[in-house]
Amino acid sequence: TLLTDTSINTDAAAWSYQSEKETADAIDILWNILKSRHQIPSSKVHIVMSSGLMQELDKYKKVEYFANVIRPVSLDPSIKITYITPEQEAQLSLLGIVPQKRRFTATQIDVGSGNTKGGYFDANKKFVPVTFPLGTKSFQRLIESKTAGDLSEYVKTADAIWRDSLRNTVINEFVVKQDVRNRDIMYISGGIVWAIASLMRPESCNNNYTELTAQEISEFRRMLFTDYDKLIKPDLSFIKVPEQERACQKNINRVLKTYDRKALLAGAIWFDDLVQEINTVNPNKKL
């Protein structure tokens, strides 16, 4: 049972002293909430690094180092900081996000900071994972490693990376795992999805599920480049309940604090191109 949502967003994958300290401080805060407010025993506490973060750290053999450096002094020594694989995270995401009535008929895709993962259950109810070692922040780093130019060059570089390499990687994955394209409903999640829903459908801030269209994802991508100021300041005057309007504005502020313009662009370009490739077979797929 989820007792409360106390999520704290830190840029753990930045690998700076500041991001490491912020992550350690966040763990310390959450551990004290569990221990003091909810009296949850140490044996029931699990601290798990996301698969995307683990993949990035593993490239430099820093998984163990990172687990140690983000461990707050106050944390019970019996609590381990572990990690999860992309395949494990994909299956757990589907089980946690997709309603039970659609568990065996829908697909699910989660666009994380370091990777993108998802999948579906096949006719034999066996989970088929779909994973790509690229997410919002890792794609941003890849783009920035190839250009130091202005925003226009940034977008051109991102488009070239998709065209020259990423598209073939995606196509090869979907040739084998065809139900990602064929099924009628796909549940989407992750930071960039949260950002799109928050800015394109701000009134949905308190909803568990929000239906988006492929056109809205493409429009979000366009506005990031050509109409950024309008995008980040959506009109909330149509929300008639003051408390809801304040909650939606607070949600937008969280998005903008978490992601800068280039991070949003990287995530939007990757996600938009991915969705367009998925929709080549079934363009009316519900998202």
What does each model-identified segment do?
Residues 1, 108-116, 123, 189-192:
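A short acidic Gly-Thr/Ser loop motif
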Residues 1, 91-94, 113-117, 271:
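Short glycine/serine/threonine-rich phosphate/pyrophosphate-binding segments
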Residues 13-28, 55-66, 71-105, 128-129, ...:
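Helical "lid/coupling" subdomains associated with nucleotide-phosphate turnover
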Residues 44-46, 107, 185:
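Structural motif
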Residues 116-132:
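A cross-taxonomic marker for long C-terminal extensions/tails that follow the last structured domain
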